[in-house]
């Protein structure tokens, strides 16, 4: 049957991905005492790499229910393989908004024997918001939340400030081995790969991958605007420039904008350069980055995409309302004819292009992020009373370095301090090697 074929296909890809995810495999090998005998509600893109995370959590003792945090990001063969192994997963590619909400709500009541969640593993904060707003009783036995992405972390800090956050949370996004690898290298690689299918780079990889698969355009000699120059924006800009594009940056933070200038990028405001660009990429996490005045200034067949978590950066509602017609070119590629006679090409309906039009980040960088997630879940679940008070916390530097160490063993060899060097620098031989406030 089709379901069996999908599950078998997914299982083969999961086994292949495990070779590139040494951090998660090390967790399985080194934690056979099963430190996570717990019910975890997970909401994160249901991809092959996420399947390896889910099965790691299960091997560590957890009962898991899962949904995807984006209506387009599920890889159906990955979901089928996980479902075939007996794990409750509620996700498929191309969900409606109503189906998406049904999925994340249904997973909360799908634990065996009527049990409720003890932990939340979130990406974007949707499950956290749902439980806080609609199912507050579930928080009584919830020991904590780990959050994957910038957008969700921002929401947690806002909830904490307003007195609405009721359980401690760990900010996985700002672990160095997440933000400086997944956000930076993963995004840019996917973007490029989706532009040229034989390039396998990492966030630098996934952006290009998405654009290429969707449009088949040549990037070289094009003008590209990247809105936002955080870690994700940096990766996108580097990927586009590496493909031969002339890249313009828009940014609100003067320090980050100065960084972009020093990297050789033109820094401008969107209104002044919207008529010059062939490709637009939003990577800000903010709303209304591209809207009416920008659409009307754009070239014919300008390509617009978003790599921020939510679909608020591009004013898609205005496009739908004001366009003369919409032509669907292929899945997640739509061409809007405006009243001025020019067309706009929108990818993935303004949602994550690297997962809507491609397969997301590579297994290696996702292993880094997901190993942080596993360690965060263990830290919260096994914490002594008062170790993680109500608030938003970080994993300690020692664990961040351990995540890096597990993955470096696959890629290279690490130099060790001698006892004399350790004494001279006043740094333990096994780390941590940097202070908590060190900026990599």
UniProtKB/Swiss-Prot annotation:
What EC identifiers does the entry list? 3.13.2.1
Q: One GO cellular component from the entry? A: cytosol
Chain's role: Adenosylhomocysteine is a competitive inhibitor of S-adenosyl-L-methionine-dependent methyl transferase reactions; therefore adenosylhomocysteinase may play a key role in the control of methylations via regulation of the intracellular concentration of adenosylhomocysteine.
- InterPro entries membership: Adenosylhomocyst_ase-like_sf (IPR042172), Adenosylhomocysteinase-like (IPR000043), Ado_hCys_hydrolase_NAD-bd (IPR015878), NAD(P)-bd_dom_sf (IPR036291), S-Ado-L-homoCys_hydrolase_CS (IPR020082)
Q: Which reaction does it catalyse?
A: S-adenosyl-L-homocysteine + H2O = L-homocysteine + adenosine
Protein family: Belongs to the adenosylhomocysteinase family.
| Record organism | Pneumocystis carinii
| Origin superkingdom | Eukaryota
> In the record's cofactor note, how is the cofactor described as bound?
Binds 1 NAD(+) per subunit.
Give binding positions for NAD(+): 149-151, 183, 228-233, 251, 307-309, 354
Alphabetically sorted, this entry's keywords are: Hydrolase, NAD, One-carbon metabolism
Under SMART domains, the record lists: AdoHcyase, AdoHcyase_NAD
The UniProt record lists the keyword DNA-binding: no
Q: Which residues bind substrate?
A: 47, 123, 148, 178, 182
Which coenzymes or cofactors are required? Answer: NAD(+)
Biochemical pathway: Amino-acid biosynthesis; L-homocysteine biosynthesis; L-homocysteine from S-adenosyl-L-homocysteine: step 1/1
| GO BP annotations listed | one-carbon metabolic process; S-adenosylmethionine cycle
Its protein name is: Adenosylhomocysteinase
Please name the GO terms that the record assigns under molecular function: adenosylhomocysteinase activity
Q: Which SUPFAM superfamilies match?
A: Formate/glycerate dehydrogenase catalytic domain-like, NAD(P)-binding Rossmann-fold domains
The keyword Hydrolase is assigned to this record: yes
């Amino acid at each position: 049957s089709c379901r069996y074929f999908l599950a078998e296909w997914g299982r083969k890809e999961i086994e292949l991905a495990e070779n590139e995810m040494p951090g998660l495999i090390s967790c399985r090998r080194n934690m056979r005492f099963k430190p996570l005998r717990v019910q975890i509600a997970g909401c994160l893109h249901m991809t092959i790499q996420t399947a390896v995370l889910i099965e790691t959590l299960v091997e560590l003792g957890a009962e898991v229910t899962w949904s995807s945090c984006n209506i387009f990001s599920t890889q159906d063969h990955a979901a089928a393989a996980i479902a075939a192994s007996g794990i409750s997963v509620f996700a498929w590619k191309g969900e409606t908004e109503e189906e998406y909400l049904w999925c994340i709500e249904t997973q909360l009541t799908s634990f065996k024997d009527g049990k409720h969640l003890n932990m939340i593993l979130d990406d974007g904060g949707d499950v956290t918001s749902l439980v806080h707003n609609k199912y507050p009783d579930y928080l009584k036995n919830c020991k904590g939340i780990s959050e994957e992405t910038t957008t969700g972390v921002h929401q947690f800090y806002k909830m904490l400030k307003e007195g609405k956050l009721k359980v401690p949370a760990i900010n996985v996004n700002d672990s160095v081995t997440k933000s400086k690898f997944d956000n930076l290298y993963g995004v840019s690689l996917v973007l490029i790969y989706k532009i040229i299918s034989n390039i396998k780079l990492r966030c630098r990889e996934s952006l290009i991958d998405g654009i290429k698969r969707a449009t088949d355009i040549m990037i070289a000699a094009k003008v590209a605007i990247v809105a936002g120059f955080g870690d994700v924006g940096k990766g996108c800009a580097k990927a586009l420039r590496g493909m031969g594009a002339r890249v313009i940056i828009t940014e609100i933070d003067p320090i980050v904008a100065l960084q972009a200038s020093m990297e050789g990028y033109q820094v401008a405001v969107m209104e002044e350069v919207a008529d010059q660009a062939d490709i637009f990429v939003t990577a800000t996490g903010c709303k209304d980055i591209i809207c009416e005045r920008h659409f009307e200034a754009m070239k014919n067949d300008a390509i617009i995409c978003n790599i921020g978590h939510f679909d608020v950066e591009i004013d898609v509602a205005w496009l739908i309302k004001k366009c003369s017609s919409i032509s669907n070119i292929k899945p997640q590629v739509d061409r809007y004819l405006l009243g001025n006679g020019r067309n706009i090409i929108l990818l993935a309906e303004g949602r994550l292009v690297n997962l809507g039009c491609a397969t997301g980040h590579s297994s290696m960088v996702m292993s880094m992020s997901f190993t942080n997630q596993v360690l965060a879940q263990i830290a919260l679940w096994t914490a002594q009373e008062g170790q993680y008070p109500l608030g938003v916390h970080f994993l300690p530097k020692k664990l961040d370095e351990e995540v890096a160490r597990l993955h470096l063993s696959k890629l290279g060899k690490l130099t060790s301090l001698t006892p004399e060097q350790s004494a001279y620098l006043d740094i333990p031989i096994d780390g941590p090697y940097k202070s908590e406030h060190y900026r990599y």
